[in-house]
Amino acid sequence: MIACRMSSQDLSISAKLINGGIAGLVGVTCVFPIDLAKTRLQNQQGKDVYRGMTDCLMKTARAEGFLGMYRGAAVNLTLVTPEKAIKLAANDFLRQLLMQDGTQRNLKMEMLAGCGAGICQVVITCPMEMLKIQLQDAGRLAVCHQASASATPTSRPYSTGSTSTHRRPSATLIARELLRTQGLSGLYRGLGATLLRDIPFSIIYFPLFANLNQLGVSELTGKASFTHSFVAGCTAGSVAAVAVTPLDVLKTRIQTLKKGLGEDTYSGVTDCARKLWTQEGPAAFMKGAGCRALVIAPLFGIAQGVYFIGIGERILKCFE
């Protein structure tokens, strides 16, 4: 079995993938409604449908029911396992590869490893978020449609097709349509924006987590406690999430296929940034920052906690 060293532990690649996958599933289940609110807040242009995260969640629950807050969760739960597994395992592998002695911390090498992890994960992240965003934003578009229909009954607020199609899209339907009309590139719309967000995030997150976690390493066990790893993951995750929020806003706007009446479309990152700055002001770049911190902090706290508990190793031992 292929293995590499992480601190004083020998963790197999298989165990790392299992740990990352389990952590992703648990984390997404816990924080998905907040992520949905983040997407809807970031996509608001002009008149706001939602005043903030709490208002968004309350209106969503009333209009769409409890399950409405989990629109798009199936896509995330399906693909977050390989995504988080690749991200965590790639960072660990690259850190081992770049720091052969394993003793002295090197910030540049840690940042480079984080950069590599961000690049590796995007093969899953981009199509996953592409599909997830369409499902998450469907409820907001339905509200916009109803509001504009009440004001001008003959208006058509966005694209062609039936209202029910927009209200109840499915990931399979969206994926098939994108592949039919645009090919594989349709699923990778916003790839550049995704890289611009995920690479800086990983460059900030992984070195920051490693150094924060190192502060709690016990001399007896040679590793940090679960609680310390969890807190370190939450802290590093929230800092990195807020730092790259402007890039996440651009990515969300670019990947959103259907727009409400009067909402802008974008040809790329530069066009999106320019329109956002001139039409909505600099504050628009930080839309959903609080939601992102609340999503990413526990998501990566749980991820690192599970990773360091070593659930993957225990599962593999059951099959030995």
UniProtKB/Swiss-Prot annotation:
One of the GO biological process terms? L-glutamate transmembrane transport
Which UniProt key words apply to this protein? Membrane, Mitochondrion, Mitochondrion inner membrane, Phosphoprotein, Repeat, Symport, Transmembrane, Transmembrane helix, Transport
Q: Which Gene3D superfamilies did the record assign?
A: Mitochondrial carrier domain (1.50.40.10)
Give Gene Ontology CC terms. Answer: mitochondrial inner membrane
Among the Pfam families in the record, one is Mito_carr
Q: Does Glycoprotein count among this protein's keywords?
A: no
Q: Where are the transmembrane segments?
A: 17-37, 66-86, 110-128, 190-210, 230-250, 293-313
Q: Would you tell me the protein name for this molecule? A: Mitochondrial glutamate carrier 2
Residues recorded with modification Phosphoserine:
S150
**What's one GO MF term for it?**
amino acid:proton symporter activity
Q: According to the record, where are the Solcar repeats?
A: 11-97, 105-215, 224-313
Task: Write down the chemical reaction(s) this protein catalyses.
Answer: L-glutamate(in) + H(+)(in) = L-glutamate(out) + H(+)(out)
